């Protein structure tokens, strides 16, 4: 389905200042390099300014400073990237689900499904589950016993919710995600691992997004908790009892060990790992591949990953790391010897 919106309508939608033809028809979005004569683009990152003069876009989202030297159609906004985010939903080709229950769905007698919800083929909804208004369940989703999905939720095909998973409003969960799987809990008895029942659940706040193949384990006793507005990328592992504060975002392949607490408005880049039973305060940024081994009490950016080098240089650096203990001992010896020399450069009476 092709959407056509006039440039003037987009300006009104954004509250933007229009420079150019308000009747210009816009049919889609594209990058500066690839946009055609009916598509809207944007300039948010200065490194792409070099493409501004040659773009074929019908119109651009620009800051005022960039719009001054641009002769084409423009929507002038304070933040072009944020404006692009808002407009993107107007051109989203994702099919809209229709209300109703597919005849192949299996629904427990005491489950409650709002009439406005869309339940796709081969969905399973177990006893005591509750599905809110305008919820979409894609094909082959499983909603476990006593689990709840708040209004406006959207679950892609093959999402699995175990029992006692509570999901807030307007939550988006992508395919393959598993919420409420048993946490990794075992007690050691003379070298043999004894399983610990995971009797907590999972609680997800409002406006959360959960990526493809991400796993959020149920709590051992209390719930694993994901706050409002949290954004989780693909292939993230969140262990039992973890708590994630509101509006924290995590990129792919983050791993969080059990009982760790992460504050509000944090950002975790790809491949970050956290040990268990630590606390991360609000407004912390962890760069890619950082390994967090203790609590963080001060906001700011933290790193521990090794930056990329040419392979030959990296091998030399790795070899030097193995020599650090010896270098440290030699440095201490030099410091001791230098301390035995008097200020005038002569050896002390102690020789």
From Swiss-Prot:
Which UniProt keywords are present, listed alphabetically? Answer: Acyltransferase, Lipid A biosynthesis, Lipid biosynthesis, Lipid metabolism, Repeat, Transferase
Gene Ontology cellular component list: membrane
Report whether Transferase shows up as a keyword of the record: yes
Which species is this UniProt entry from?
Pseudomonas fluorescens (strain Pf0-1)
Give the matching PROSITE patterns: HEXAPEP_TRANSFERASES
Q: Does the keyword Transferase apply?
A: yes
Q: Which reaction does it catalyse?
A: a UDP-3-O-[(3R)-3-hydroxyacyl]-alpha-D-glucosamine + a (3R)-hydroxyacyl-[ACP] = a UDP-2-N,3-O-bis[(3R)-3-hydroxyacyl]-alpha-D-glucosamine + holo-[ACP] + H(+)
Q: How does it assemble?
A: Homotrimer.
InterPro entries, A to Z: Hexapep, Hexapep_transf_CS, LpxD, Trimer_LpxA-like_sf, UDP_GlcNAc_AcTrfase_non-rep
Active site residues of this protein: 240 (proton acceptor)
Xref: Pfam families: Hexapep, LpxD
Q: What does this protein do?
A: Catalyzes the N-acylation of UDP-3-O-acylglucosamine using 3-hydroxyacyl-ACP as the acyl donor. Is involved in the biosynthesis of lipid A, a phosphorylated glycolipid that anchors the lipopolysaccharide to the outer membrane of the cell.
Tell me what this protein is called: UDP-3-O-acylglucosamine N-acyltransferase
Family membership: Belongs to the transferase hexapeptide repeat family. LpxD subfamily.
Please give the Gene Ontology molecular function terms for this protein: N-acyltransferase activity
Superkingdom? Bacteria
Name of the top EC class for this enzyme: transferase
Q: What is its EC number?
A: 2.3.1.191
């Amino acid at each position: 389905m092709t959407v056509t919106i006039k440039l003037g309508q987009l300006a009104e939608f954004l509250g933007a200042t229009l420079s150019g033809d308000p009747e210009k028809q816009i049919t889609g979005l594209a990058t500066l390099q690839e946009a055609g004569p009916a598509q809207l683009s944007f300039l948010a990152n200065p490194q792409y300014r070099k493409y501004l003069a040659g773009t074929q876009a019908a119109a651009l989202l620009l800051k005022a400073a960039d719009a001054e030297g641009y002769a084409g159609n423009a929507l002038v906004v304070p933040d072009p990237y944020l404006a692009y985010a808002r407009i993107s939903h107007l051109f989203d080709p994702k099919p809209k689900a229709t209300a109703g229950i597919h005849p192949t769905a299996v629904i427990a007698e005491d489950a409650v499904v709002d009439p406005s919800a869309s339940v796709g083929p081969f969905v399973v909804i177990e006893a005591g589950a509750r599905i809110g208004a305008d919820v979409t369940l894609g094909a082959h989703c499983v909603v476990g016993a006593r689990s709840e999905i708040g209004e406006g939720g959207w679950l892609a095909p093959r999402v699995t919710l175990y029992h006692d998973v509570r999901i807030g409003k307007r939550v988006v969960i992508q395919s393959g995600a598993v919420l409420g799987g048993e946490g990794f809990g075992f007690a050691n008895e003379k070298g043999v691992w004894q399983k610990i029942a995971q009797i907590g659940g999972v609680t997800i706040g409002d406006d959360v997004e959960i990526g493809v193949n991400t796993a959020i384990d149920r709590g051992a006793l209390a719930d694993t908790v994901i706050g409002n507005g949290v954004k989780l990328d693909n292939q993230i592992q969140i262990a039992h009892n973890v708590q994630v504060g509101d509006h924290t975002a995590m990129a792919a392949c983050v791993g969080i060990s059990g009982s760790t607490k992460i504050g509000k408005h944090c950002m975790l880049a790809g491949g970050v790992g956290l040990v268990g039973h630590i606390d991360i305060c609000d407004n912390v940024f962890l760069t890619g591949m950082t390994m967090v081994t203790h609590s963080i009490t001060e906001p700011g950016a933290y790193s521990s990953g090794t930056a990329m080098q040419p392979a030959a240089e990296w091998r030399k650096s790795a070899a030097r790391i193995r020599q650090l203990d010896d270098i440290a001992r030699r440095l201490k010896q030099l410091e001791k010897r230098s301390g035995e020399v008097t200020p005038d450069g002569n050896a002390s009476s102690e020789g």
